[in-house]
Amino acid sequence: MRIGHGFDVHAFGGEGPIIIGGVRIPYEKGLLAHSDGDVALHALTDALLGAAAQGDIGKLFPDTDPAFKGADSRELLREAWRRIQAKGYALGNVDVTIIAQAPKMLPHIPQMRVFIAEDLGCHMDDVNVKATTTEKLGFTGRGEGIACEAVALLIKATK
């Protein structure tokens, strides 16, 4: 078994909506990013790549490459997952924690879990997504951006 950890953060800027966990969430602010700014899927992709010792999302999909401008993070996750599976790994489970003062994530979490399970080709029981605030402390608490942490457990597939 192998475990990976991922972290991502994006500052608010421009107009909404925002995309988190593949879900378009109405909000007056947008997120500044080279791709679609989906902190949840970026952190998850990093966790999966880390567990497989395959670097990180910036190595695989550099923000200096115009091909990834405005990229759909679900597509990036699926491509990273294909590469990880090709290395002989299967999914154990993933756990994602979104850190945001606003907007409220709870109504959107069920759909996030559906999208992640679809993209990884796994059962919903293998995907957990939760959200928390920082009780108005730090940059997320001041409403300056959104952060996310994720962990992933991979299992070496039998040969």
Curated annotation (Swiss-Prot):
<dbReference type="InterPro" id="IPR003526">
    <property type="entry name" value="MECDP_synthase"/>
</dbReference>
<comment type="function">
    <text>Involved in the biosynthesis of isopentenyl diphosphate (IPP) and dimethylallyl diphosphate (DMAPP), two major building blocks of isoprenoid compounds. Catalyzes the conversion of 4-diphosphocytidyl-2-C-methyl-D-erythritol 2-phosphate (CDP-ME2P) to 2-C-methyl-D-erythritol 2,4-cyclodiphosphate (ME-CPP) with a corresponding release of cytidine 5-monophosphate (CMP).</text>
</comment>
<keyword id="KW-0414">Isoprene biosynthesis</keyword>
<feature type="binding site">
    <location>
        <begin position="56"/>
        <end position="58"/>
    </location>
    <ligand>
        <name>4-CDP-2-C-methyl-D-erythritol 2-phosphate</name>
    </ligand>
</feature>
<dbReference type="InterPro" id="IPR020555">
    <property type="entry name" value="MECDP_synthase_CS"/>
</dbReference>
<feature type="binding site">
    <location>
        <position position="8"/>
    </location>
    <ligand>
        <name>a divalent metal cation</name>
    </ligand>
</feature>
<feature type="binding site">
    <location>
        <position position="142"/>
    </location>
    <ligand>
        <name>4-CDP-2-C-methyl-D-erythritol 2-phosphate</name>
    </ligand>
</feature>
<dbReference type="Pfam" id="PF02542">
    <property type="entry name" value="YgbB"/>
</dbReference>
<comment type="subunit">
    <text>Homotrimer.</text>
</comment>
<keyword id="KW-0479">Metal-binding</keyword>
<feature type="binding site">
    <location>
        <begin position="132"/>
        <end position="135"/>
    </location>
    <ligand>
        <name>4-CDP-2-C-methyl-D-erythritol 2-phosphate</name>
    </ligand>
</feature>
<protein>
    <recommendedName>
        <fullName>2-C-methyl-D-erythritol 2,4-cyclodiphosphate synthase</fullName>
        <ecNumber>4.6.1.12</ecNumber>
    </recommendedName>
</protein>
<feature type="site" description="Transition state stabilizer">
    <location>
        <position position="34"/>
    </location>
</feature>
<feature type="binding site">
    <location>
        <position position="139"/>
    </location>
    <ligand>
        <name>4-CDP-2-C-methyl-D-erythritol 2-phosphate</name>
    </ligand>
</feature>
<comment type="pathway">
    <text>Isoprenoid biosynthesis; isopentenyl diphosphate biosynthesis via DXP pathway; isopentenyl diphosphate from 1-deoxy-D-xylulose 5-phosphate: step 4/6.</text>
</comment>
<dbReference type="InterPro" id="IPR036571">
    <property type="entry name" value="MECDP_synthase_sf"/>
</dbReference>
<feature type="binding site">
    <location>
        <begin position="61"/>
        <end position="65"/>
    </location>
    <ligand>
        <name>4-CDP-2-C-methyl-D-erythritol 2-phosphate</name>
    </ligand>
</feature>
<feature type="binding site">
    <location>
        <position position="10"/>
    </location>
    <ligand>
        <name>a divalent metal cation</name>
    </ligand>
</feature>
<dbReference type="GO" id="GO:0016114">
    <property type="term" value="P:terpenoid biosynthetic process"/>
</dbReference>
<dbReference type="GO" id="GO:0008685">
    <property type="term" value="F:2-C-methyl-D-erythritol 2,4-cyclodiphosphate synthase activity"/>
</dbReference>
<feature type="binding site">
    <location>
        <position position="42"/>
    </location>
    <ligand>
        <name>a divalent metal cation</name>
    </ligand>
</feature>
<feature type="binding site">
    <location>
        <begin position="8"/>
        <end position="10"/>
    </location>
    <ligand>
        <name>4-CDP-2-C-methyl-D-erythritol 2-phosphate</name>
    </ligand>
</feature>
<dbReference type="GO" id="GO:0019288">
    <property type="term" value="P:isopentenyl diphosphate biosynthetic process, methylerythritol 4-phosphate pathway"/>
</dbReference>
<feature type="binding site">
    <location>
        <begin position="34"/>
        <end position="35"/>
    </location>
    <ligand>
        <name>4-CDP-2-C-methyl-D-erythritol 2-phosphate</name>
    </ligand>
</feature>
<keyword id="KW-0456">Lyase</keyword>
<feature type="site" description="Transition state stabilizer">
    <location>
        <position position="133"/>
    </location>
</feature>
<comment type="similarity">
    <text>Belongs to the IspF family.</text>
</comment>
<feature type="binding site">
    <location>
        <begin position="100"/>
        <end position="106"/>
    </location>
    <ligand>
        <name>4-CDP-2-C-methyl-D-erythritol 2-phosphate</name>
    </ligand>
</feature>
<dbReference type="GO" id="GO:0046872">
    <property type="term" value="F:metal ion binding"/>
</dbReference>
